Amino acid sequence: MSDMFNGSSSLKELNLNNFNTNNVTNMECMFYECTSLKELNLCNFNTNNVTNMRNMFSGCSSLKEINLSSFNTNNVTDMNKMFSGCSDEIKMMVKSQVKNIKQEAFEDYDDDLNN
């Protein structure tokens, strides 16, 4: 699923509730540079086998709300720049399965994580 919606700059809203992601291992750049995307519902994504989420939402500068409540990141080894270029006003819904997120995931994020 890497690069699946990469560069879809006119995409404003996306609901992928019914996507079967059980066997997916790579989600790198999946939504990269979807600059008009404001809302993204991934609440049923199975990420148990995913190892790469690098730049997954990078450049989604209009994104205001994202539902990651089903995400399990236990096997993810690369989250670099996952939210790079995202608005600092983004609302993220996550649960306890989201682990091991390092600061690199927010590299070049529009907000200062050190404050």
Regions picked out by a protein language model, each given a short descriptive name:
Residues 2-115:
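Negatively charged
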